[in-house]
Amino acid sequence: MSRRRAHDTEDEGYDHRRNKRRRVSENQEIEDRLESLILRVGERSTSSVESNLEGLVSVLEADLGTFRLKILRILSDCAVRMPEKCTVYTTLVGLLNAKNYKFGGEFVDHMVKTFKESLKMCRWDAARYSLRFLADLVNCHVISATSLLQLLDTMIDVSNEDTVPQVRRDWFVFAVLSTLPWVGRDLYEKKESALESLLLRIEVYLNKRSKKHHNALRVWSSDAPHPQEEYLDCLWAQIRKLRQDNWAEKHIPRPYLTFDTILCEALQHNLPQIIPPPHNDAFVYPMPWVVYRMFDYTDCPDGPNLPGAHSIERFLIEEHLHHIIETYHHERKDCAAQLLSFPFKHKIPLEYCIVEVIFAELFHMPTPRYLDICYGSILIELCKLQPATLPQVLAQATEILFMRIDSMNTSCFDRFVNWFSYHLSNFKFTWSWDEWDSCLLLDGEHPRPKFIQEVLQKCLRLSYHQRITEMMPTTYGKLIPQVPVPNFKYASEEAASLPGTAVAHQLVVAIRQKCSPEEVVNILKEIPNSGYSGEEMSDGTFNALKIDVFVQTLLNLGSKSFSHSFAAISKFHSVFRALAETEEAQICVLHNIYELWSSHQQMMVVLVDKLLKLQIVDCSAVATWIFSKEMTSEFTKMYLWEILHLTIKKMNKHVIKLNTELSVAKDKLSKADSSSSESDEDAPTKRKKPITHADKPSEEAVERMEEKLEAANVNQKRLFLIVFQRFIMILSEHMLRSDTDGRDPDTDWYRWTIGRLQQVFLMHHEQVQKYSSTLETLLFTSDLDTHILEVFQQFVALRA
């Protein structure tokens, strides 16, 4: 072979590889272009949606041979991820089906697979959007109405299942009901009797289902002026109204109507039989909710009318706005812009709809989807983008909330306080306070003055005391927070008569001279083991005076800032641990922090959090301290419950962390064992990567992890038992006293306390649920007062 020919062969090989790379690159470019075209179809452009669709159909039809799988995947993804463009994509699929029946069948199969997979994986929203898409394909003559009705009937069959949670049955009924606005008209025209039969089955189920959970999820206890409807009841009323209107709605864009002459000639596909996966105890279903209403048409100025509470348009608008928030909540500026670009904004009072939906999210029970600050930041961006109208609507909403605050759920009260204080801090703390001065005549425990007091406390965290004083009218003096300074009793006028003053002064000098923890311990030894708080020392386990002197002196010296306090606690961590070995001693530490910092709520919160992190105090000690007699005057203040919830969350996170670590370790152990046995069997034929000792946890290590998790679960259960037992005790005492004195027990204090009990159940429902049977056996027994017992029963009903 000549050198010339060899050189030519090498060139040919190089050219072949280069051409292959070019083909791959070109294919990728075409795929990216197709994806971009499909994703952007129907969005704003100079041409209409219909002409966009016609052009896209021509492009896709030409590329079906090469990029069929890619197109199938993109379209099915769009169906789930972009439900607001459902009818645009169903029209696109309908036009492709009219031109290529085989592709239409493949897409239906792909969509059915997506639907079944979503149900199996408990992706409930994705399943609902898939069902809606399949239903809308009936309008595009892709799927037969008969086969869709069979699927809907099969889903309603779930409502007759026995021994399954009601939340499972509820979801399947909700999925069917929420699909009917898209396909109801077509089913009414083609299969009216079958549709009526389906609706009758739904009505039978709705009439017999339990709604014990309803009151726990209400934002307001009163139904005036707007009823707080349970979500399925509300949607059912909207569907009945739609049926009365012959299934004619005015909100859903239906581009397929333009192509009716083309689509009606296409052959249709039948859906295969789809059986919902049976219930599994590991399945977590969506919890029920209450439909939030703040405005009606009388609240809106001249312009487009707000659809009625039972019009299907209200449901469709709200669902669309909720989905925009879900899609863009990570970026507040984009979210605000998308909300204000709502496609039907000229047909509705958009600002009112947006504000109502955002507050619906913020006040969603048992917990909002996102952090409170997420909604606050979106509202601020909306005010910036729409300064002429949105601030006025928001002010109107705030006024409505304040006027209805008397019957507001306690959890929602807290969220309202947090939002309003944050909002004020972004707008120079400007508000027309004079309009609310009638609340000054009310009792301090009444929700209105309490709201203003709590708002000012939160504003203090975001500003400084003088600023708060300057922004408020002088008439509000009694609601303005105290100046947040430490009350160091060993420097007061009465200090000379207090035991421990001399040691406290000695300690001040030593700490300022940067003494060691050991030196502090030696100084504290000068305090005798008796003669102070004899009741607490009866068991001889701790010295209350030592704790008093040490805690108050150290934290007073660190009072300049949070950082100074943290540094002081960290440096003398060993002294804290030595003094606070028992729960009683830890409660004594907490009480002394309160005595020093009673005028600074935020300092109290961060210091308790720090003590928990450093394991100086246990979660159970914090819970017991909160319910102690010394804290009676603080019992209805928000910061105390902030401390309780951060304590419970810390315990919950610890349990979840240990649970995750154990699961990972067990998984590694089982994989290592199976890998080892497989490699033994395959040794002659196959070499495997060896399992190192570091990768595989020992069985002893796993056992230790199990023991740690078991101990953590015991501590968590004990914490919940302490909290709920204390609630029952103080509420039962209140009921008994009221009965003895012949007074109405329904006082402001009672409503706050029962609200806090409900808040603990709902805020930590996932963890509390594990112990519901224990709680029922030990605490929430049938002989308990019905008002207290009802809170527990409502909680249990959420997952029933």
Curated annotation (Swiss-Prot):
Stretches of the chain forming a coiled coil according to its record: none
Domain of life, per lineage: Eukaryota
GO molecular function: mRNA binding; RNA cap binding
PTM-bearing positions, type Phosphothreonine: 9
GO cellular component, one term: postsynaptic cytosol
GO BP annotation list: 7-methylguanosine mRNA capping; mRNA export from nucleus; negative regulation of viral genome replication; nuclear-transcribed mRNA catabolic process, nonsense-mediated decay; primary miRNA processing; regulatory ncRNA-mediated post-transcriptional gene silencing; RNA splicing; siRNA processing
Subcellular location: Nucleus
Listed Basic and acidic residues bias regions: 692-704
Region described as Disordered: spans on this chain: 1-26, 669-704
SUPFAM superfamilies assigned to the protein according to its UniProt record, in alphabetical order: ARM repeat
Main location: nucleus
Domain MIF4G: 31-243
Similarity field: Belongs to the NCBP1 family.
Biological role stated in the UniProt entry: Component of the cap-binding complex (CBC), which binds cotranscriptionally to the 5'-cap of pre-mRNAs and is involved in various processes such as pre-mRNA splicing and RNA-mediated gene silencing (RNAi). The CBC complex is involved in miRNA-mediated RNA interference via its interaction with Ars2 and is required for primary microRNAs (miRNAs) processing. Also involved in innate immunity via the short interfering RNAs (siRNAs) processing machinery by restricting the viral RNA production.
Subunit structure: Component of the nuclear cap-binding complex (CBC), a heterodimer composed of Cbp80 and Cbp20 that interacts with m7GpppG-capped RNA.
Protein name: Nuclear cap-binding protein subunit 1
Species per Swiss-Prot/TrEMBL record: Drosophila persimilis (Fruit fly)
Source species taxonomy: Eukaryota, Metazoa, Ecdysozoa, Arthropoda, Hexapoda
